[in-house]
């Protein structure tokens, strides 16, 4: 299995073969994680540092669990109490960490490009856990694995991505990945949240959700990212749900076996009807969480192999 990358900074750097290699390896970890003994030693002797400059629950927990199940020594750095809060630059922090000789750095940062900058200053492997509006590669990979397992393939599907696309690194990474795998993508949302430049990705853009959902195989809902908005993007949450919230009536326009996805955390009654989110016959939201651990285990193993081959 060939994977010739030192870091995982974005989906843009990956070929379709790279994507398939990660997903195929992740499949083996799905099986491992369902066993009573969920342990491997492929990262034994390696140190993983998780640096989250933005608050996170599920992503940080997923990376921590992935590292521990692979046998790594895992450390979570509290960025709220870090030297950066005292005025230290990101580059100084990177150089300080580099002097400690970690093997894997998992980084989330509110500014686009910050993780790439940090990766240029360290000797270890760096995994991007989300940077600003830029990318969230492991989320796109876990979404891809979820789709492949549910639909039996990851190509030539009609996939709708709905909601706050303007502020979403998840949308951008999924657009790139799903495009590389030759799927047909539709972007659905109000013009304020689906900028025209996203059509450059080869996607069809709809501001009418009912029209956009016709005959799709996958419906991927996105969270309204109010923390990245400065007002005026939507008239009200009630009006937004009426036009762009996923309910059973709107889902009825998709294919009968269409699956429902959401990267979380969800705003029930705003982006998606709560009972639909919990419907095990349509929703694969819990499967996405499960696939996240397996995908991150696979990505870290592939990067660790390259680390060891380089020494």
Curated annotation (Swiss-Prot):
Domain of life: Bacteria
Binding-site residues for L-aspartate, renumbered to this chain: 86, 169, 223
GO cellular component: cytosol
UniProt GO MF annotations: amino acid binding; aspartate carbamoyltransferase activity
Catalytic reaction(s) noted: carbamoyl phosphate + L-aspartate = N-carbamoyl-L-aspartate + phosphate + H(+)
InterPro entries per record: Asp/Orn_carbamoyltranf_P-bd, Asp/Orn_carbamoylTrfase, Asp/Orn_carbamoylTrfase_sf, Asp_carbamoyltransf, Asp_carbamoyltransf_Asp/Orn-bd
GO biological process, one term: amino acid metabolic process
Catalytic activity, EC: 2.1.3.2
Pathway linked to the protein: Pyrimidine metabolism; UMP biosynthesis via de novo pathway; (S)-dihydroorotate from bicarbonate: step 2/3
Residues the record lists as binding carbamoyl phosphate: 58-59, 108, 136, 139, 264-265
UniProt entry keywords in alphabetical sequence: Pyrimidine biosynthesis, Transferase
Signal sequence annotation: none
SUPFAM superfamilies with a match to the protein in the record: Aspartate/ornithine carbamoyltransferase
Role of this protein: Catalyzes the condensation of carbamoyl phosphate and aspartate to form carbamoyl aspartate and inorganic phosphate, the committed step in the de novo pyrimidine nucleotide biosynthesis pathway.
NCBIfam families: asp_carb_tr, PRK00856.1
Similarity comment: family membership: Belongs to the aspartate/ornithine carbamoyltransferase superfamily. ATCase family.
Subunit note: Heterododecamer (2C3:3R2) of six catalytic PyrB chains organized as two trimers (C3), and six regulatory PyrI chains organized as three dimers (R2).
PANTHER family: ASPARTATE CARBAMOYLTRANSFERASE, ORNITHINE CARBAMOYLTRANSFERASE, MITOCHONDRIAL
UniProt protein name: Aspartate carbamoyltransferase catalytic subunit
Organism of origin: Ruegeria pomeroyi (strain ATCC 700808 / DSM 15171 / DSS-3) (Silicibacter pomeroyi)
Classification lineage: Bacteria, Pseudomonadati, Pseudomonadota, Alphaproteobacteria, Rhodobacterales
Name of the gene: pyrB
């Amino acid at each position: 299995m060939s994977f010739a990358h030192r870091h995982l900074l974005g989906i843009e750097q990956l070929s379709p073969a790279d994507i398939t290699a990660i997903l195929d390896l992740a499949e083996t970890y799905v099986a491992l994680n369902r066993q009573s003994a969920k342990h491997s030693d492929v990262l034994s002797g390696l140190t993983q540092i998780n640096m989250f400059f933005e608050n996170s629950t599920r992503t940080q927990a997923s990376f921590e669990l992935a590292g521990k199940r692979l046998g790594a020594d895992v450390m979570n750095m509290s960025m709220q109490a870090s030297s950066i809060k005292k005025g230290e630059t990101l580059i100084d922090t990177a150089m300080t960490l580099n002097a400690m000789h970690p093997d894997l750095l998992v980084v989330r940062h509110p500014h686009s490009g910050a993780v790439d900058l940090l990766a240029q200053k360290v000797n270890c492997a760096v995994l991007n856990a989300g940077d600003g509006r830029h990318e969230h590669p492991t989320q796109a990979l876990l979404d891809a694995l979820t789709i492949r397992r549910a639909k039996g393939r990851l190509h030539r599907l009609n996939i709708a991505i709905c909601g706050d696309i303007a502020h979403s690194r998840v949308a951008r990474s999924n657009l790139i990945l799903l495009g590389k795998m030759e799927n047909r993508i539709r972007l659905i949302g109000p013009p304020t949240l689906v900028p025209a430049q996203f059509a450059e990705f080869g996607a069809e853009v709809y501001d009418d959700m009912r029209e956009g959902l016709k005959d799709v195989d996958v419906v991927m809902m996105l969270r309204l990212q109010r923390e990245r908005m400065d007002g005026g993007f939507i008239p009200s949450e009630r009006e937004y749900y009426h036009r762009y919230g996923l309910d059973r009536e709107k889902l009825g326009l998709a294919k009968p076996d269409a699956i429902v996805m959401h990267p979380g955390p969800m705003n029930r009654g705003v982006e998606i009807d709560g009972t639909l989110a919990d419907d095990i016959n349509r929703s694969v939201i819990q499967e996405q969480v499960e696939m996240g651990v397996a995908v991150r285990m696979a990505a870290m193993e592939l990067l660790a192999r390259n680390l060891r081959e380089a020494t």
